[in-house]
C-alpha cells in the first residue's frame, strides 16, 4: 500500500499534486496555447482566446501570442497590413490600384495619397506608375488645355 494514501499529510500532498498536474482531456491538449490548463478545464470546450507559438517550434528567448480579437482584425483586413515579403507585394499592388483608380477618375497627378504607409515603397510605386502612364498624363493635360470650360 502507498503510505501517502494512509496519512492525512499524504492526502494533502496527493490532492495538491492532482490539482497542479492534472492531465486535461485530449481536446484541450490539441488546443495548445490556453492561458492555463486549470481554467480551461473549468470552462470546458469553449473558443480559445489566445493562439501561441507551439513549443516544438519555439526558439529560446522568443515567444508570441495573438488574441482572438487581433486574429479577427487581421482576417477582416485580408492580409493588407501583415508584415513580411507577401505584405510588401500586397502593399505595392494596393498603391498601384489606388493610383489607377485616381487616374481613371481624372484626378490631378499632384494629389497626395491620404495615408502613405511606407514612404519609400509608396514613392517608388507611384513614380513607376507615373513613368508608365506618362503618355496618358501628357494627352490628358493637352486635351484639358484645348477644350473650353463647360
Swiss-Prot record:
Residues 1-23 have a biased composition (Basic and acidic residues). Keywords: Cytoplasm, Cytoplasmic vesicle. Transmembrane segments: none annotated. It comes from the Eukaryota. It is found in: Cytoplasm; Cytoplasmic vesicle, Secretory vesicle, Acrosome. One of its GO terms (cellular component) is acrosomal vesicle. This is Testis-expressed protein 22.
Amino acid at each position: 500500500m502507498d503510505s501517502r494514501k494512509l496519512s492525512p499529510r499524504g492526502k494533502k500532498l496527493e490532492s495538491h499534486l492532482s490539482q497542479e498536474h492534472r492531465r486535461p482531456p485530449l481536446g484541450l491538449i490539441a488546443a495548445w496555447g490556453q492561458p492555463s490548463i486549470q481554467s480551461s478545464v473549468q470552462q470546458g470546450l469553449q473558443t480559445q482566446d489566445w493562439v501561441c507559438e507551439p513549443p516544438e517550434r519555439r526558439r529560446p528567448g522568443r515567444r508570441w501570442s495573438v488574441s482572438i480579437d487581433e486574429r479577427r482584425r487581421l482576417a477582416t483586413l485580408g492580409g493588407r497590413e501583415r508584415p513580411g515579403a507577401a505584405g510588401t507585394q500586397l502593399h505595392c499592388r494596393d498603391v498601384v490600384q489606388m493610383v489607377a483608380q485616381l487616374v481613371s477618375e481624372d484626378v490631378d497627378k499632384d494629389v497626395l495619397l491620404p495615408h502613405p504607409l511606407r514612404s519609400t515603397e509608396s514613392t517608388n510605386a507611384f513614380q513607376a506608375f507615373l513613368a508608365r502612364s506618362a503618355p496618358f498624363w501628357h494627352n490628358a493635360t493637352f486635351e484639358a488645355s484645348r477644350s473650353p470650360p463647360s
